Every structure is written in C-alpha cells, then in structure tokens.
C-alpha cells in the first residue's frame, strides 16, 4: 500500500497500466483509488494481515524455494493452535521483536490462522500493527511449540518476561508476505471472522 498526492486528475485505469509496465515482473499494483486528502497508506490503516508459508516436506518443492521456509520436521498443529490462542489479544510483545530502540511494544493480535495442506503450513497473522521481526519471531516460536521445544502453556510467561531470549527463533524472511492492509473496521472484522471459522 502506498499513497501519493497529484496536482492533476488522472485516469485511474491508465495510471495502473502504466505503473505496472514500469515494475519488475514479481511486483504488481492491483488497484488505484482516489482517497480523501488526509489519507495515509500506513497511518490510516486499522489492521494488517501477514502470511507466513512453510514447506514441511523432506525435499522442498523446487518452485517454492524462494517463497517458503523449508522446515522438514513433524509438527503438532494442535499445540501450535493452543499457543496461538495465548498470543491473541493485546499484549506487550517485547519478547517477540528484535527492536533495539525504545518504542511502544504493545500491539493487538486479532487472529492467528494455522492452515495445513499438502505438507505445507500457512500461518496468518492479523493485528493492528507489527514490530520489527515480530511475525518472524512469532512464527519461529510457534514452530518451536510444534516441535515440542516450547510448551503452549509457556507463552504467557514468555509474554510477561519481555525478554527476546525467551521466545523462539526468527523464521527466515523468505516465507513472509504482507497479504492485506485494512482501512475499515468492516474489512478487518470480516477477515478476522474468516480466520476464526477455519
């Protein structure tokens, strides 16, 4: 998501086409829309959804190697789901960030989705905002829960500790995608509901 201010009116469809013609093949602008003058792509957002994709096969699918984290281990999805419930809500996520500067570390996780299909996991994280490396550390922590290194019941203690050393490893960046930014409460509520109904 991005925002810009233009002095002259534009044809949105033409602008979209021209913009995409200038971008590399792996980046696409999907929509162009006029907004109010005070709109800001980051500050006007009420929530974001990140997805993290993990390949659990012994040998990773060759076409997924750039876009998924290869983690060839059996995982206990029920334990991961239990741990995710402890993470949902408003918490100080100091234990789950590599942030070095003093900054407000309280965030709200509205929903965590865990979907297993065809030897792959898709984790969906919907929150009001995320700290530096937060989704990667949360993902690594859930994988540590899934392999038995961390018990689901330890998550509240890890949150209380406010100590990065207590949480799991940071999953690599290559499985992480910003999948959606929400600008209305209705959109956000619908996405949260979809995850909870899975």
Feature names for model-found ranges:
Residues 1-198:
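Structured-RNA-binding interfaces characteristic of tRNA pseudouridine synthases
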